[in-house]
């Protein structure tokens, strides 16, 4: 199958390392696995920060900001995907790996500029309320692609929007490369929190910090609050600009006594990749139990993860304290976390499911 992947920047720079085994493969969304199986895979990138004309920004970006256009609609991404159309027409199926690229390419399908079947990896479409204008502009696009979600939390809401979306909404739980993310060495102690998505609940972690008797390292591109507790180190880390390499992230996971993933209570999965990567490294994880929990039947509190209520600093601090106070139980939690990822969250299974969804898109564009 000829499969064209359309990404935001940062993926192509990691492609050769992923192919050679020197870097993790999950950041290519299963493409490396499909390539190894003999499928013809191509990669393309679109920069949402590219310059766009003043008129385009006013007509598109401003209207999207007012929630009159589909979520994540962008003049720059529409222009960037338009330039890719000739090459994408040669593929059997296109996989858009972000909500922004999915919305843009579905727009070109709606305009009949692209006939190639489209699979869009989307998240957060329902985070903000939909008015009549957003509904009128978004539903026609959703009917022109197959939407792939990372967890079941958003699926009922999407399917309820329009009966014609039946069979077009699919769940494919994220999987990670357990050959790269693997245990190594002994932890040196401390608490690690890492992540850049907009749903990280850093405020709750900072509020919990005074009750955590350990140094807390936060790695993120987000700005720190004005006042930090004495035991919190806030360091810049940006995946796209590679301020921190994948091997350095792995070393940080391995060194941590516990990895904390505080997230806000939203319906989309958040903190998924960090949780799975840290778990694959055999580290105990404290994770917020949200509406968007991607695999509630597999993530079992006290067995392979510690789950805490959203926005509860006391519960978060108590869970971290529990891990720090009980090293034997923490080791058992980490071993169970690694086994769970190997059994239920491997990138190979993610790639196989993606191929299945691509075939469904080809059968029903």
Pin down the residues of each PLM region.
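Conserved acidic donor-binding segment of nucleotide-sugar-dependent glycosyltransferases
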Residues: 196, 299-313, 322-327
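A short, well-ordered alpha-helix in the C-terminal region of glycosyltransferases
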Residues: 315, 322, 329-344, 350-353
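Donor nucleotide-sugar binding/catalytic pocket of nucleotide-sugar-dependent glycosyltransferases
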Residues: 143-159, 164-181, 188, 196-199
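Short acidic/histidine- and often glycine-rich active-site loop of Leloir-type glycosyltransferases
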Residues: 227-228, 289-302, 306-307
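N-terminal subdomain of nucleotide-sugar transferases
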Residues: 1-49, 89, 210-211
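Membrane-proximal helix-turn-helix segments that form the acceptor-binding/catalytic region
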Residues: 82-90, 125-147
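Acidic donor-binding loop of glycosyltransferase active sites
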Residues: 253-270, 283
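Conserved catalytic-core segment of nucleotide-activated headgroup transferases in glycan assembly
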Residues: 26, 187-249
């Amino acid at each position: 199958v000829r499969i064209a992947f359309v990404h935001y920047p940062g993926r192509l720079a990691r492609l050769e390392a992923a192919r050679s085994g020197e870097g993790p493969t999950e950041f290519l969304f299963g493409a490396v696995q499909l390539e190894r199986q003999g499928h013809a895979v191509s990669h393309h990138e679109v920069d949402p920060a590219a310059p766009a004309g003043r008129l385009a920004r006013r007509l598109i970006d401003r209207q999207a900001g007012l929630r009159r256009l589909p979520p994540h609609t962008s003049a720059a991404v529409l222009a960037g995907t338009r330039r890719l159309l000739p090459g994408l027409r040669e593929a059997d199926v296109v996989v858009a790996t972000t909500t922004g690229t999915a919305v843009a390419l579905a727009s070109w399908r709606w305009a009949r500029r692209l006939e190639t079947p489209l699979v869009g990896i989307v998240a957060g479409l329902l985070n903000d309320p939909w008015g009549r204008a957003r509904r009128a502009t978004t539903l026609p696009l959703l009917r022109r692609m197959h939407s792939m979600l990372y967890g079941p939390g958003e699926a009922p809401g999407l399917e309820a929007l329009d009966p014609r979306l039946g069979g077009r909404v699919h769940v494919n739980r994220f999987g990670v490369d357990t050959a790269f993310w693997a245990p190594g060495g002994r932890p040196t102690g401390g608490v690690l929190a890492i992540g850049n998505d907009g749903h990280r609940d850093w405020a709750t972690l900072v509020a919990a910090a005074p009750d955590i008797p350990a140094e807390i390292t936060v790695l993120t591109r987000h700005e720190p609050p004005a006042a930090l507790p004495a035991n919190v180190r806030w360091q810049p880390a940006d995946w796209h600009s590679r301020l921190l390499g994948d091997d350095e992230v792995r070393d940080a996971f391995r060194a941590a006594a516990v990895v904390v993933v505080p997230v806000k209570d939203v319906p989309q999965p958040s903190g998924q990749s960090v949780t799975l990567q840290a778990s694959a490294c055999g580290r105990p994880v404290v994770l917020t139990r949200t509406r968007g929990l991607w695999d509630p039947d597999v993530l079992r509190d006290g067995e392979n993860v510690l789950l805490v209520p959203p926005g509860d600093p006391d519960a978060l601090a108590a869970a971290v304290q529990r891990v720090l106070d009980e090293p034997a139980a923490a080791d058992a939690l980490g071993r169970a976390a690694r086994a769970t990822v190997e059994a239920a969250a491997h990138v190979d299974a993610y790639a196989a499911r993606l191929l299945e969804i691509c075939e469904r898109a080809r059968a029903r564009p």
